[in-house]
Swiss-Prot record:
Binding residues annotated for Zn(2+) 1, in chain numbering: C37, H59, E143
Gene: parE
The keyword Aminoacyl-tRNA synthetase appears for this protein: no
Catalytic activity: 2-deoxy-scyllo-inosamine + NADP(+) = 3-amino-2,3-dideoxy-scyllo-inosose + NADPH + H(+); 2-deoxy-scyllo-inosamine + NAD(+) = 3-amino-2,3-dideoxy-scyllo-inosose + NADH + H(+)
Pfam families (alphabetical): ADH_N (PF08240), ADH_zinc_N (PF00107)
Source taxon at top rank: Bacteria
Protein name according to UniProt: 2-deoxy-scyllo-inosamine dehydrogenase
Length: 339
């Protein structure tokens, strides 16, 4: 089979390898699509945490089960998506339902081979069946939508609240829709790339600003009636954290969802103290996979604005380049693994 491998920083190679054999408790999935996440790009550059070279990347995927043993034989022929988290199940974090914090965490696409290939093995407990009518292309966004829903709920976003978002990549655009689904309103979104701001407008965000320092704060100063109760930081850029701290209302909440490890964030702690702000981090999909599948199947979430550029694995260099440069109106590149 063909598989894309990250061998070292900025070294992506298309390889030929044997189809993997599923271990007990695993299924073999014939992959259909995989979208490129911002974390994949950081991994590609060599500036990420908890990864292993060489490895096949990819964790936002869809496919069809072709082999499953034991009590999971009924999965064969089913279209599925899956959680990237492979937890031990027995450490103190796992036993209280927090597998993302597992002491021996493994992740598909980071520490074990992921979905930028024709086939992949996955623990059967990680799989979620897809209903008829939900396309495999759209289903690549189940995992990131679950991430967005989990973040909005961890921030306890409720009906009637005003929310600002920094960053309009895939997660930022899904956050905008997750906020709406919870009955709150995205009043403004900050994003430097014109096409991504246009995508946000197409999804119903009424106001956008660029990503330069001070633009979000300046907007709030001009429109105090739109001062956000919550700011969701989805860009991962350090300056956006300080911007969020200054823009949110006193007593408000800041959600840290995007992050990068290349640069450290610098902020003025007195803003947090004097304004009595709450900062809440969120990582991973939590237990929102089922809801994400239902929402996509019902057409309640638009992913066409996200899936902007399709590539085959053979064109991986261009796919990664376009995604890294956010070029040609890119919001999210994805691989058609059946091409």
């Amino acid at each position: 089979m063909k598989a894309l491998m990250f061998k070292a920083p900025l070294q992506a190679v298309l390889t030929e390898r044997d189809v993997p054999e599923p271990a007990p408790g695993e299924a073999l999935v014939k992959l259909a699509y995989n979208s490129i996440c911002g974390s994949d790009l950081s991994f590609y550059k060599g500036v990420w945490h908890g990864f292993t070279y060489p490895v096949v990347p990819g964790h936002e995927w869809s496919g069809t089960v072709v082999e499953a043993g034991g009590g999971a034989a009924d999965l064969v022929g089913q279209n599925v998506v899956g959680d990237l988290t492979v937890a031990c199940g027995s450490c103190r974090h796992c036993t209280v339902g927090k597998p993302t914090l597992c002491a021996d965490l493994q992740e598909l696409g980071f520490t074990r081979d992921g979905a930028c290939a024709e086939y992949m093995t996955v623990p059967t407990g990680n799989l979620h069946r897809l209903p008829e009518g939900l396309s495999l292309r759209e289903a690549t966004q189940v995992e990131p939508l679950a991430v967005a829903l989990n973040a909005v709920d961890r921030l306890a976003v409720t009906a009637g609240e005003k929310v600002a978002i920094t960053g309009a990549g895939g997660i930022g655009l899904l956050l905008a829709q997750a906020v709406r689904l919870r009955g709150a309103e995205v009043t403004v979104l900050a994003e430097p790339v014109t096409e991504r701001r246009q995508a946000a407008h197409a999804l119903g965000v009424p106001h956008t600003v660029g990503g330069d320092p001070g633009e979000l704060v300046g907007f709030v100063e001009k429109h105090p009636e739109l001062t956000p109760d919550v700011v969701l930081e989805a860009s991962g850029y350090p300056l956006a954290v300080q911007e969020a701290v200054e823009a949110v209302r006193s007593g408000g909440r800041i959600g840290l969802i995007g992050y990068r490890i290349e640069e450290a964030a610098t902020m003025a702690p007195h803003h947090i103290v004097v304004k009595v702000l709450s900062l809440q981090a969120s990582m991973g999909p939590g237990d929102r996979f089922g809801e994400a599948i239902e929402l996509l199947a019902a057409g309640a979430v638009d992913v066409d604005a996200l899936l902007s550029h399709e590539f085959g694995l053979a064109d991986h260099d261009r796919a990664l380049d376009v995604a890294l440069r956010r070029a040609d109106g890119n919001t999210r590149s994805y691989f058609n693994l059946r091409a």
